[in-house]
Regions:
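Jelly-roll (double-stranded beta-helix
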Residues: 1-146
Length: 146
């Protein structure tokens, strides 16, 4: 893995038998199915070893001085509302199943699809409808975080 000074990272296993991370300081972290994840500083030196032939990982990276990122792994059963504050950006990644954004002409989301949500004018919400599993990531400016 490349080193990225001043950057935070979060890795989440998407597919495969797993990934073992070996950090230079001796820490070992195993990402195992179905969707294990780990957050760490991009300043750290590490190597990754897949547990099988193929592994797929979602790699979120952000500048820690500029934004704060919160993530949630959630089931999607029916309707979920995502509340959007001005300046925030939400990543919705569909880990499994199908979903659609209500009140839009956007095509339905399938496993592996992602969508970015933003508040165009003031606080609002988007409604997701479907069934499956989601990874939600909220990106918020460090200046507005509590």
């Amino acid at each position: 893995f490349s080193r990225f000074a001043g950057v935070e990272r979060e890795l989440m296993l998407l597919t495969g038998d797993g990934l073992t991370l070996h950090f230079e300081d001796g820490q070992v972290c195993d990402l195992r199915p179905p969707h294990a994840r780990v957050r760490f500083s991009g300043d750290r030196v590490l190597q990754g070893a897949p547990a099988g032939q193929v592994v797929s990982v979602l790699n979120l990276m952000w500048r820690r001085d500029d934004v704060v990122v919160s993530t949630w792994h959630r089931p999607l059963v029916g309707t979920v509302a995502v509340f959007l504050d001005p300046g925030d950006c939400w990543l919705v990644y569909l880990l499994a199943g199908q979903a659609r954004l209500a009140r839009t002409d956007a095509r339905p989301l399938d496993q592996g699809d992602a969508v970015l949500l933003r508040a165009p004018h003031g606080r609002c919400h988007q409604v997701l409808d479907g069934g499956g599993e989601l990874l939600l990531a909220r990106v918020r400016s460090s200046a507005t975080s509590d």
